[in-house]
């Protein structure tokens, strides 16, 4: 399909900046706009453009978004606009789901165990409650646990070094000690949390070029929706 026909059929009402984002062919493209301005609509159009105008194999496209619900909604919207066949061929995934694919590939192909299983939410709360009581000699309130989990997520997502953690002021007393004990408890139980999935996958990609090359060959185009919600 030529570009003019594609724009007529699928990009009606798009402004020049939106069209430029859809048509971009080389390098990285970042689309910044206020909520509700149509970023996801533009992303869906770009996916269609890559397939219909550029001849990209949909199996070579990875689209990531923030929640499981959002992946289902994007697949539905793309399928309604461009056909379910293309939508089924594409990988539309959360970041955590992609991380588990990377971890699984590493485990299967490098003779490693798949490391850890996912810690349940209630289990994580229980572990943190026990550690909090041990360190503070007091019972943790719901607010204290919530603040702890927020701080731990920040530390893991930002991949802070022990030195950076010591210097960080995240509003939680004894955070370095609690953080260390929490991770020790998870390892002893063979568990990891959602944030561990991403940092573990990142470490694998950095340390094992063969794994990185595999996913680079598998996906020639990567699109990220709601990228403002991702960490570094």
Predicted region positions:
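Conserved helicase NTPase motor core
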Residues: 3, 11-23, 27-35, 62, ...
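Conserved P-loop NTPase-based nucleic-acid remodeling module centered on helicase motor cores
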Residues: 60-150, 166
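Short, contiguous pre-domain boundary segments
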Residues: 1-4, 161
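Phosphate-binding Walker
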Residues: 38-45, 68, 73
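Walker A/P-loop NTP-binding motif
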Residues: 41-57, 77
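Conserved catalytic network of the ASCE P-loop NTPase/AAA+ motor domain
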Residues: 53-57, 83-85, 215
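Basic/charged alpha-beta structural segments of nucleotide/phosphate-handling enzymes
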Residues: 124-195, 209
